[in-house]
Amino acid sequence: MSTPCIITVAITGSVPRKEHDPAVPISVAEQIESTQAAFEAGAALAHVHVRNDDQSPTSDPARFAELLHGLRRACPGMIVQFSTGGRSGKGPERGGMLHLGCDMASLSTGSCNFPTIIYENHPDLIRFLAKRMREFGVKPEIEVFDLS
């Protein structure tokens, strides 16, 4: 008996830079190419972050739009999940791209300690992001980092 599963690919993340690994796809074109390779290998869902030209994380809706349109062309039928993570912005701008038509988005349900930072997710922000997701028909990926 087989068990159905969804393979998710997170090709960039918000931390790695080219200096850490030259193969990390940073530009939109690199991300599309890398995601397409994963899609062709069987990945069904892409969890995506976008970057500025200096490789820093961003919540820039224009970058997300460019990536989304490219992924829709290169990977038809793939589920696209936007990151609303805190390393790419503070407050409401973390949800500024949810109107673009992604299928899913991450929804962190609390704050936690990462090795070098506090990943802050204020209850008001969580409610705001959840409301925006509902408003635009985006399915949340509920993230629970710390149960304490």
Predicted regions and their residues:
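Catalytic cores of alpha/beta
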Residues: S88-L100, L147-S148
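Active-site beta-loop-alpha junctions enriched in small/polar residues
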Residues: A10-S14, R51-D53, S83-R87, S108-C112, ...
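Glycine-rich, proline-tolerant flexible connector loops at the mouths of alpha/beta enzymes
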Residues: E19, A44-E66, F114
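Conserved, mostly hydrophobic/aromatic
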Residues: Q31, A38, H49, A105
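N-terminal small/glycine-rich loop or linker at the start of catalytic domains
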Residues: M1-A23, S106-N113
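Structural preference for beta-strand elements that scaffold enzyme active sites
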Residues: P4-A10, L45-H47, G77-Q81, C102-S106, ...
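Catalytic alpha/beta core domains of metabolic enzymes, predominantly
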Residues: M104-S148
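Alpha-helix-loop-beta-strand connector modules within alpha/beta enzyme cores
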Residues: T3, V9, S56-F82, R127-E135
